[in-house]
Amino acid sequence: MASPCLTKSDSGINGVDFTEKFRLEDSTLLANGQVVLTDVPVNVTLTSSPYLVDKDGVPLDVSAGSFIGFNLDGEPKSHHVASIGKLKNIRFMSIFRFKVWWTTHWVGSNGRDIENETQIIILDQSGSDSGPGSGSGRPYVLLLPLLEGSFRSSFQSGEDDDVAVCVESGSTEVTGSEFRQIVYVHAGDDPFKLVKDAMKVIRVHMNTFKLLEEKSPPGIVDKFGWCTWDAFYLTVNPDGVHKGVKCLVDGGCPPGLVLIDDGWQSIGHDSDGIDVEGMNITVAGEQMPCRLLKFEENHKFKDYVSPKDQNDVGMKAFVRDLKDEFSTVDYIYVWHALCGYWGGLRPEAPALPPSTIIRPELSPGLKLTMEDLAVDKIIETGIGFASPDLAKEFYEGLHSHLQNAGIDGVKVDVIHILEMLCQKYGGRVDLAKAYFKALTSSVNKHFNGNGVIASMEHCNDFMFLGTEAISLGRVGDDFWCTDPSGDPNGTFWLQGCHMVHCAYNSLWMGNFIQPDWDMFQSTHPCAEFHAASRAISGGPIYISDCVGKHDFDLLKRLVLPNGSILRCEYYALPTRDRLFEDPLHDGKTMLKIWNLNKYTGVIGAFNCQGGGWCRETRRNQCFSECVNTLTATTSPKDVEWNSGSSPISIANVEEFALFLSQSKKLLLSGLNDDLELTLEPFKFELITVSPVVTIEGNSVRFAPIGLVNMLNTSGAIRSLVYNDESVEVGVFGAGEFRVYASKKPVSCLIDGEVVEFGYEDSMVMVQVPWSGPDGLSSIQYLF
């Protein structure tokens, strides 16, 4: 990591003048002169950020951020918990680890409200009516725990509203007592820009990761996918995969991605012979004590014989046959754990690198996370672990075999196991660096640098050290069809939890990886609820339906005939007025998320109330008293129009066309006009927000809406050209395309041919056929 200047100076750094936003005066941390933390201990230090430009040389707001550190008296240790001051009566939102592998959203107002293993905190600005440019009040403040040297940090509550920083190496052999840049604080008047600007500073400071904007997500993000997990669990086999793909193709929803999940590898129990595969393991959970025996696939896939050539066998033949038969299948991914399998490698396996059984050790913070079957099984049986100097050999062996078999990428699971195995390997930071470097090198060599879905990775170790190449990752806990603890209501409230996990986690993780909201099942009672969120998530869309059990009517609102999807330009985030609220168990707050398509905004409203984290029981549970019909308001200003790589200018826009997907109603609205929404439990509404433009030649007001048969309606709009007396819209997809027009057109043309159209409630309706192999059409509206 680069070493920042440790000297504060009112005259600036390197001759650049600035006024610092953060000051430490009289044991008080101030931002814009407003109190952030009080009773700051005397051993706490504040150092201005020295970084003048980002990695591209673009100037940074050098005054906006500072580093917090502290000196600790006494003998250096591997684990410290130190206060950086008291937080009192300031609303905050945070992201914390509720499981070893997964994080979620948490809100509060005082230091005592902070959860263990908190990865990020954002403090609200002062004054409920404050807004951008409010100036003199307290700005939004980001507090970000960092890595320093061989130590990693997180937040937790301390005594009497202290904000405590937990600093740990993970190994008693790695100790320290002085930290200079262990927390970064950043201030700004836009909470979304705040996080992005802060991450640009940390990108330069650490130089151990790349931001999402520097990378390209894999092509699977634009394809409809099918994952085998909930369809087969561990019984997945070539015949079943073939039948699953064929059923989707025959139903008009061909997948572009097939993800072969857990169940394809050669694994075994320690009690079995080294040549005995665990083929009788069929129940999820039974496989976790098993270890990898070899890089090659198990007999289910190894015994595959191509119907085209009896000599063509194994995974390679199966992959080739599947792609040859189903032309839309562009990508086949397979699952593997970071350490090979749930139980790691079998130490005596001759085809694998040498490994040693290590008993994982939970840190004090992890001991307070939710009980988890995977963690229990792993601790019970240990991990067959290849030392970090063998990690490159391990990934090369596994990934070279998969690439040779025609596999296009991997879902890497159980990523945050390393911190439990690091005692003898220099601590968690050094071990993570070694393993992630080896993984990155292999992915660059075998899977185009980006052919990875990261999973079970929700911790700052991975975000700061594992994302140099990886650009796609899960942002929520698993999609749970039912509650594994047996609560029948979990079929519903767990779905609300899933939405909130993904939406809020993306505010943090979306800076490093394209958010993946996970699979779902199209026949689940909350399937449409899930489908709506995936449609506007900005990430991949894939299902885990059992073979032959599909809701094709729903799927066709997500999937185009060529296996593509209508993906948003950005990634979905909570609306600004929901950042510091609790959409899971306050009984009143509706989740609202926003995203951008190429020419429009989109808002999603979801009633998620009914379950979530309980501090007392240390687990997610039902809060049935919070299940209510909710009413909320939304408006075009809920869309953050200036965000993303292609922001939409609304500087001269006076009116917006709002299209509600459920009722198919059109409303006209000003930027700040409120629209009231009422939603029953686990129901949703999607709203296309389209800026209205006046056509100069005839004063017709016009706004494109999109394909109303698709959940991401305006995602179908690929081009938009306004002429003096006409508008031309490029469309991707097929179905009923609508636009708002204040007057009825004289005629409509599709690809130069005059077509019939309808005009009702100020909407022009045209039926667009699927055009050619690429599904692109051009509609002209003549006025």
Curated annotation (Swiss-Prot):
Disruption phenotype: Reduced drought tolerance, but no effect on freezing tolerance or on the ability to cold acclimation. GO terms for biological process: response to oxidative stress; response to water deprivation. One of its GO terms (cellular component) is chloroplast. The keyword RNA-binding does not apply. Keywords: Carbohydrate metabolism, Glycosyltransferase, Phosphoprotein, Transferase. Belongs to the glycosyl hydrolases 36 family. It catalyses: alpha-D-galactosyl-(1->3)-1D-myo-inositol + sucrose = raffinose + myo-inositol. This is Probable galactinol--sucrose galactosyltransferase 5. Pfam families: Raffinose_syn (PF05691). InterPro entries: Aldolase_TIM, Glycoside_hydrolase_SF, Glycosyl_hydrolases_36. Induction: By oxidative stress and cold treatment. One of its GO terms (molecular function) is galactinol-sucrose galactosyltransferase activity. Its EC number is 2.4.1.82. Transglycosidase operating by a ping-pong reaction mechanism. Involved in the synthesis of raffinose, a major soluble carbohydrate in seeds, roots and tubers. The modification Phosphoserine is found at S9, S11.
